[in-house]
UniProtKB/Swiss-Prot annotation:
It is found in: Mitochondrion outer membrane; Cytoplasm. One of its GO terms (biological process) is mitochondrion distribution. Involved in the regulation of mitochondrial distribution and morphology. Required for mitochondrial fusion and mitochondrial network formation. Belongs to the misato family. This is Protein misato homolog 1. Keywords: Cytoplasm, Membrane, Mitochondrion, Mitochondrion outer membrane, Phosphoprotein. It comes from the Eukaryota. InterPro entries: DML1/Misato, DML1/Misato_tubulin, Misato_II_tubulin-like, Tubulin/FtsZ_GTPase_sf. GO terms for cellular component: mitochondrial outer membrane. The modification Phosphoserine is found at residues 41, 495. Pfam families: Misat_Tub_SegII (PF10644), Tubulin_3 (PF14881). It comes from Macaca fascicularis.
Length: 569
């Protein structure tokens, strides 16, 4: 591990969290593979914050995510729970019993063709059980790019992807995957549907001890653990798993940052009554309990509402995506997540998770909203001031927390990241003697341009901003979502020439007054429920008094975001 890295341990809880996480780790892998590219700006993001180094039993160096993930039986497809890097057939064959053996062999899931192709380019598992890795620069990241004599790699299609492991291109450590065997991923029976079920999972000694052992394994090898980031499904029983996990982290690792990303999949329909009621209850219980035990909580969704009334999914001017496909939705959310988490992953002058949370969560405002412009609309020949001026007075990013349009709302504090803009475009290149069309055009650095723009948009608001040269790397299996973009993500008038390879992204975390209306609406929807009709949810471990307390907590939390409650009032 590189000296000085401020390590983060990621917990990934739930199946949609698995989709977002797969895209997230694929992006980290793509960035690692580009680390030796002379054209890349070196040293902006520190991979050791998220990754750990290790060595197999056969002495081969490995680089794997510092990750614990939990999912249900049947969710892994052909991915092995113990991973592939550390497998040893010689040890598997060492059986002490000398008597008669009966072998029960379970039929293997067919491997996704994309993963077969990926593994064949990464290396092979030889007959002696040793994983032979092909040569990779620095032992990290993706293999070298294909040449004219090598076959073109397969790209997974939407039709070929059933579960997140179908497109994960990163090797995991054997301590990463923890399966909840008592609940099923597929089918109508044995599902993890309710908050109370999720809470009870981590109350069982078996699963609690399993999680604690894995936490201790990763934490004890860290030099300076700054905290934990939790990617957690909010819509199902994993909201309860996440709440108990956050409580355990708060108790065991007091003083460390805990930032929770509450994930919700695409749009829903009125006709699915039970599923919608459960989603409402799970989201409400999850938000309140996660807020109690986290430093910061941010809902992430492409939906327009957290409540019972369906709203259309959000729109991106330069993206064409199918909101019913988790593969698409999770790719967009992972792009935003990789951008807004930049502050605590920087190599130089990082903002710790605790400091970031403290800045955004004053006066009890521990829930924040996220937004992103994907891609940031910079046309050939334009400068950053030109592009920012095109937004006018409108909020420049698309909302990603199901809190409605941000227009007319108030921001109390914000953390903003703009990445992937070439340094030559940071400032206006006006001909000497030409009067600047705006104050932004008179700025002498990109950082000054961004800071002044934010000050104009949100006067008297506590803002933290970061400007990075490093773009978001769009590498297979990222879906084809972009329209009218160059390979570097610049906005084009005509047809694009070649596939998009990277994009600039503008992302933000904001403590916003929009949460006042969102949380109050959530509480109103809950008061309309006849809980006698949803006895199955209550039977999973939730009492009527718990619902009454939930309503009080939601209303108190909503009041924190009343437009008049800020540092400047």
């Amino acid at each position: 591990m590189a000296g000085g890295a401020r390590e983060v341990l990621t917990l990934q809880l739930g199946h949609f969290a698995g989709f977002v996480g797969a895209h997230w780790w694929n992006q980290q892998d793509a960035a690692l593979g580009r680390a030796t590219d002379a054209k890349e700006s070196p040293g902006e993001l520190c991979p050791d914050v998220l990754y750990r180094t290790g060595r197999t039993l056969h002495g081969q160096d490995t680089c794997t995510p510092r990750l614990i993930l939990m999912d249900l039986k049947g969710s892994l497809s052909s991915l092995k729970e113990e991973g592939g890097l550390y497998r040893d057939k010689q040890l598997d064959a060492a059986i002490a019993w000398q008597g008669k053996l009966t072998t029960h062999k379970e039929e293997l899931c067919p491997k996704n063709p994309y993963l077969q192709d990926f593994l064949s380019t990464e290396g092979v598992l030889s007959s002696d059980g040793v994983w032979r890795v092909k040569s990779i620069p620095n032992g990290k990241g993706s293999p070298p790019l294909t040449t004219a004599t090598t076959p073109k790699p397969l790209i997974p299609t939407e039709a070929s992807i059933r579960v997140w492991s179908d497109f994960l291109r990163v090797h995991l450590h054997p301590r990463s995957i923890c399966m909840i065997q008592k609940y099923n991923h597929d089918g109508e029976a044995g599902r993890l549907e309710a908050f109370g079920q999720g809470e009870s999972v981590l109350k069982e000694p078996k699963y609690q001890e399993e999680l604690e052992d894995r936490l201790h394994f990763y934490v004890e090898e860290c030099d300076y653990l700054q905290g934990f980031q939790i990617l957690c499904d909010l819509h199902d029983g994993f909201s309860g798993v996440g709440a108990k996990a956050a409580e355990l982290l708060q108790d065991e690792y007091s003083g460390r940052g805990i930032i929770t990303w509450g994930l919700l999949p695409g749009p829903y329909h009125r006709g699915e009554a039970q599923r919608n009621i459960y989603r409402l209850l799970n989201t409400a219980f999850g938000l309140v309990h996660l807020t109690a035990h986290s430093s910061l909580v941010c809902p992430l969704s492409l939906g327009g509402s957290l409540g019972l009334r369906p709203e259309p999914p959000v729109n991106f001017p330069y993206l064409h995506y199918d909101a019913t496909l988790p593969f698409h939705c999770s790719a967009i959310l992972a792009t935003a997540l990789d951008t807004v988490t930049v502050p605590y992953r920087l190599c130089s002058s990082p903002v710790s998770m605790v400091h970031l949370a403290d800045m955004l969560s004053f006066c009890g405002k521990k829930v924040v909203t996220a937004g992103a412009t994907i891609p940031f609309p910079l046309a050939p020949g334009q400068s950053l001031p030109d592009s920012l001026m095109q937004f006018g007075g409108a909020t420049p990013w698309t909302p990603l927390s199901a809190c409605g349009e941000p227009s007319g709302t108030r921001c109390f504090a914000q953390s903003v990241v703009l990445r992937g803009i070439d340094r030559a475009c940071h400032t206006s290149q006006l001909t000497p003697g030409t009067p600047p069309p705006s104050s932004l055009h008179a700025c002498t650095t990109g950082e000054e341009v961004l800071a002044q723009y934010l000050q104009q948009q949100q006067p008297r608001v506590m803002s933290s901003s970061h400007l990075l040269l490093t773009p978001y790397r769009v590498a297979p299996p990222y879906p084809h979502l972009f329209s009218s973009c160059s390979p570097q993500g610049m906005v084009l008038d005509g047809s694009p020439k070649g596939a998009v390879e990277s994009i600039p992204v503008f992302g933000a975390l904001c403590s916003s007054s929009s949460l006042h209306q969102t949380l109050e609406a959530l509480a109103r929807d809950l008061t309309k429920l006849d809980l006698r009709r949803w006895a199955s949810f209550m039977d999973a471990g939730v009492e009527h008094d718990d619902v009454a307390e939930l309503l009080q907590e939601l209303q108190s939390l909503a009041q924190c975001y009343h437009a008049g409650d800020s540092l400047v009032d």
